[in-house]
C-alpha cells in the first residue's frame, strides 16, 4: 500500500483540487481470564494480539469530496478460536480482533470507507461506503475495524433541525471479513435462542435493505439547555426501531432521558416463524441518567429497564449500543424484563504535556434466569460488572494509549452451568490499544 502513495498526487498541480492523505498504525492486545472465583476454574483462557494499518485519503474539488479509509489488520498471536474442552465454546471478545465469519483468515483488508459526496447550500448527498453515528449503527467498535455501511445518504438542515436519511444495501460489520447484504449481515453473528428455546436460525431472513433516519435540534427550557434527537431504524418486512434521546444541562448538572420502541414489520423476516429474525410483536426500553460535574470529574448514576413486551433486538455487530447504562464489553441486546443500574465517574487532566482521560464504573444487571429463553436470548446470568479505563494522548494526538479492565461476577439466584459462565461472568478481561498516527491527514 505504501508503494502506491506517490501516485496519489495526480492532479495536485490543479489549485482547485486538494488531496490529503494520512496513515495510522494500531496495536491491540486483549485477554480474558475465565473461571476466576467460581467452580469452573478449568475454563479456557483467551488472548489475542493484532496489528493494523489504516490509510486515509481525501480529495476535494469545489463542492465535491471523495473520502477513503482503508483498513488492513493481521492477527500476530493468540488462541481466539480455540474450543474450550468443557463447553465447546471459543472466545467472545478476542475473536473480534479478526473475522468471526472466516476464522481461517488471520489477515484482512477492507475498504471500509469509499465515499463520494456533493455539498450544496441546502444539503449534502453521498454515495458509497460511509460511517454512521447512530445509537445502534455507528463506528464505535472496540475492535480492529469499525462497522461501516454501503448505500447512499442525504443530510440537510432546516427549521432548527439537522436531519439525515440513509438507505443501506450492504454492511461491513465489525469483526467480520467485509461487506455483505443486510440479510447475510443479520445472520452472521451469535444466533442465540429463538422464542421456542432452540438455536435461532437466521440464515433465511429476507431483509432487502435498511433505512436509517436521524433528526436532532438544540432545545432550551428555562435555565436548561440541551439536545433532542429522534432516530428510526427500519428493515422492511422485519422490524423497526424508534429511539428518542433528550439531554438537558444546567450548570454542572446533566439529565439524559431515553425511550426506545420496537415493532415487528410484516412476518419478521420469514414466513416460517421459526426462521424469522423478529419473532415477537414489539419491545420497549426506558433509560435515565443524571451526572454532576465537580472540578474536572463527572459523577453519574444511570438506570434503564427493558419491560415485558419483548426482548430488545438489534444486530449487535452493527455498532455499539448507546444506552445510558452502557459499559464497555457488555450489551443489553437480546434481553427483556431487565433492570440495569450503573454508577461511576469520569475525569480529564493533563500532566507533563500528556492529556489523560479516565473513568471507573460499576453496574448491576438484573436479568431473567438464563433458562428463560423468552426474555434472555443469549442465556446471560444476572451480574455485576466493574470497568476501569484510562486513555492517554500526547504529541498532538499522534500517540494514543487506551487501557481497560473489566470484572464480571454472577448474581444469578440459581446455579449456572459452565456454558452460562464462560466469557459471560466470573471473568476478568483486559484490553490494551496503542494507536500511532504515522502521518496526520495532510496535503500532498
Predicted regions and their residues:
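Outer-membrane beta-barrel translocator/channel fold
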Residues: 76-78, 164-210, 218, 251-326, ...
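Transmembrane beta-strand segments that form the barrel wall of outer-membrane beta-barrel proteins
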Residues: 27-29, 125-140, 163-165, 223-236, ...
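Transmembrane beta-strands of outer-membrane beta-barrel proteins
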Residues: 17-25, 64-68, 125, 154, ...
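Residue-level signature of outer-membrane beta-barrel architecture
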Residues: 57-61, 117-120, 155-158, 167, ...
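Outer membrane beta-barrel
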Residues: 57-88, 99-181
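C-terminal structural cap/anchor segments
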Residues: 303-393
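Outer-membrane beta-barrel "beta-signal"
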Residues: 213, 424-444
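Residues that define the transmembrane beta-barrel architecture of outer-membrane proteins
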Residues: 17, 45-51, 108-112, 145-150, ...
